[in-house]
A protein has these predicted regions:
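C-terminal and inter-domain tail/linker signature
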Residues: 1-140
Length: 140
């Protein structure tokens, strides 16, 4: 079975919800790219991404900051699955994550402020965190 964009995004969401890169790492292409609309330089390899993300996940863990990665769907600009990221509170939406898959590997991930995370349909699934999945449909 070939890797889909949705499966790639679920692995990314699981990484962010568990602060553990082990599920995502084997899915990354060696020439993987990671881009953010808030960062000038694009990361252009799997090894450079791992050098970047592992300390970032450790810093989040040590700070005690709350991060939520929820599966979502975009209908307009980039129709298809996405991850909706929130920080501090699960409804404090900060970014949308999009994935591109080629040859069974994740070729790139893009963190975007446009399209707005508020334009994404949120489906209440938080891969890697069963406690958060129990919150489906609940309103704060």
């Amino acid at each position: 079975m070939s890797l889909t964009a949705e499966q790639a995004l679920r692995a990314y969401a699981a990484m962010m919800n568990t602060l553990d890169v082990s599920e995502l790492e084997p899915l990354l292409a060696d020439d993987f790219h990671y881009a953010s609309q808030w960062v000038f330089a694009e990361i252009e390899s799997k090894s450079a991404f791992l050098d970047y993300i592992v300390p970032k996940l450790d810093a989040i863990r040590k700070s005690g900051a709350s991060v939520w990665a929820e599966m979502g769907w975009l209908d307009r600009e980039f129709p298809g699955p996405c991850v909706v990221m929130a920080q501090g509170d699960k409804d404090n939406l900060i970014t949308v994550v999009l994935a591109k898959v080629e040859c069974g590997k994740i070729k790139r991930l893009d963190l975007c402020g446009a399209p707005s995370p508020n334009s994404a349909g949120r489906i209440g699934e938080y891969p890697g965190n069963n406690d958060l999945e129990c919150l489906k449909g609940e309103q704060p």
